[in-house]
A protein has these predicted regions:
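N-terminal targeting or signal-anchor segments and their processing/structural boundaries
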Residues: 1-377
Length: 377
């Protein structure tokens, strides 16, 4: 608790320890005692070091949005959600990792982040840029040039940096292809070929899929522009086996490297090996909702995501593997299709996340119907 007096400013949480401190230990409840009458700001900190000062780079913060008046506001029932702020943008560095590959690292929020080469390069020069998932990094692949350095402009919204990258590496990354699935191919799965280098050409005549009766299966190829992966889409049948063969030259990367022969054996299960969950979403917020069916020990595996625009809707999650599931709702206040964190100085709270109160334990060949999830503000 910070007492609000004539010397109080919002930035006090960065510079000065609170007037009163307590902790939650292993519960979500907390108590302050022997408080003086007056106005207060209440914050919650999850710190990397116990200095009772807010360090936005490493700490999480939460705050009560209203001024607390003592002794009037002696009981606070509104939960305080702690969150990690998005840091201001800062370009870190550019570094050559292999011949023909540079990584551009940055911190914080990016908007239209991109790089532009300003060095003179051959007319047949090619480059591909892709963001690395869950890392503040842009990967930049390019056809090698006879030069000891390259110059770039690095753009982010209104920011501009000039960068020179020294080129010393002698070896290009060999093309490595891996499958996203080995063994069981579930009906919700998409079969991907993942590559360490950007794929620039796919020759589907050098790819074959046959079932257990040696009948050729038709498929479609779909390149995922934002990732180094190619989807092979085909109609999966129950209790079936598939042999997928990729012959030499089916995939070509930016360096004109081609693959060797690859074979993948896949099998499907019976429909009865899966289950279904239905969930009636009752939206009483009149806001847009993001509804996630999730799983995993840390509830971090999104199985399916649905978007609901201000109305109620009945959702059916079918062909699910037998295991535990959870359903969560994100109140998408700014309608941008994703969860947004908060900001202490701007006094914006993170978008609300609400979990369906019951863990959904699904068995094979079983329908979990009749679930009602009412979303209130």
């Amino acid at each position: 608790l910070y007492q609000i007096d004539s010397s109080f400013t919002d930035s006090i949480v960065f510079k000065k320890k609170p007037n009163y401190v307590t902790n939650t230990l292993d519960t979500t409840k907390f108590t302050f005692t022997n408080l003086r009458k007056g106005k207060y700001l209440m914050i919650a900190l999850k710190e990397s070091s116990s200095d009772y000062l807010f360090n936005p780079k490493v700490d999480k913060i939460g705050f009560y949005p209203d001024t607390i008046m003592l002794p009037r506001d002696s009981v606070i029932n509104t939960p305080i959600q702690v969150f990690k702020e998005i840091q201001p943008y800062r370009f870190r560095r550019a570094k050559e990792t292999n011949k023909g590959k540079i990584i551009f690292g940055y911190d914080g929020k990016v908007k239209d982040f991109r790089v532009k080469i300003t060095s003179d390069v051959p007319t047949d020069f090619k480059s591909i840029s892709k963001f690395e998932i869950d890392k503040d990094t842009l990967n930049y692949w390019f056809t090698p040039v006879e030069s000891d350095s390259l110059n770039f402009l690095v753009y982010n919204d209104v920011f501009l940096d000039t960068v020179t990258v020294r080129l010393r590496k002698k070896k290009i990354d060999s093309l490595i292809l891996k499958s996203s699935i080995n063994g069981t191919l579930h009906f919700r799965d998409t079969f991907f070929i993942n590559s360490n280098n950007p794929i620039v050409k796919v020759d589907t005549s050098k790819i074959s899929i046959i079932n257990k009766d040696t009948i050729a299966i038709s498929f479609k190829e779909l390149s995922i522009d934002t990732k180094n992966k190619v989807a092979l889409l085909f109609d999966k049948k129950p209790e079936q086996k598939y042999s997928l063969k990729i012959f030499p030259g089916a995939f070509s990367d930016i360096y004109e490297q081609k693959n060797d022969t690859l074979t993948f054996n896949l099998s499907t299960k019976e429909i009865e090996d899966y289950g279904r969950i239905t969930m009636n979403i009752v939206n009483e917020t009149n806001e847009n909702l993001i509804i996630d069916l999730i799983s995993g020990k840390n509830k971090d595996e999104i199985i399916e995501r649905n978007f609901i625009s201000g109305t109620s809707k009945n959702l059916v999650f079918d062909l699910l593997k037998p295991k535990s599931y959870f359903v969560r709702a994100i109140i998408d206040t700014n309608k941008n299709g994703k969860w947004d964190t908060g900001n202490y100085l701007q006094k914006t709270l993170p978008e609300t996340i609400i979990f369906y109160e019951t863990e959904l334990e699904l068995r094979a060949n079983y329908y979990l119907d009749g679930n009602v999830f009412t979303i209130k503000k």
